[in-house]
Amino acid sequence: YRRQRQMCIRDRNDIQAECVELNFSTCQGHVVELANLLVAYFRKKDYDVKKLKGSINYDFFNKMLTRGKEKGDMVQTAKALIEAIQPLPFYRVLNVNALSLNNAGAYISQELGYALAWGNEYMNQLTDAGIPAATVAKKIKFNFGISSNYFLEIAKFRAARMLWANIVASYHPECLRDCDNKGANGECRCAAKMA
């Protein structure tokens, strides 16, 4: 099984990883292994890691929501995943798949509220485990569903960005690098950007 996955990654010589965002999904039990494979592959191919963007779909809460199953310890897996993907600074590995709420019939306000609570739970548990708030916030990716109500969907995305920035700011994330996007107290504003 592992050999098959390695071959799948190896056979992707025609993909320009620096030009397109790559998003991967795998079994929840193998996300750390996938992260290690990706880091090794990108290093072997001499990619500029600052140009690589993408995600690994690790969503602990979605598994419980859709199947009623809890697999493993979320905090331990998330910490190992964040550590494994550290060489790829623009890869997000903690997903909030609010799409499943939308597909289950949630209204726009319900989807938005639950998604933000979901993201806040990641922030809460992982900052309590000792991971800096700026690091956690930069590793979360939101996947929203889109309904046919055009103007309310636009409003949902704008509200999500604003509300997520407020949630992240409440954790007082410290900027881990020298950037021009610092707040009044050295707060990391780039951590609050939603992907």
Residue ranges and their predicted role:
Residues 22-195:
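Helix-rich catalytic cores of soluble enzyme domains
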Residues 10-19:
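Alpha-helix-loop-beta-strand connector modules within alpha/beta enzyme cores
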Residues 1-9:
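Single conserved hydrophobic/aromatic residue that forms the stacking wall/gate
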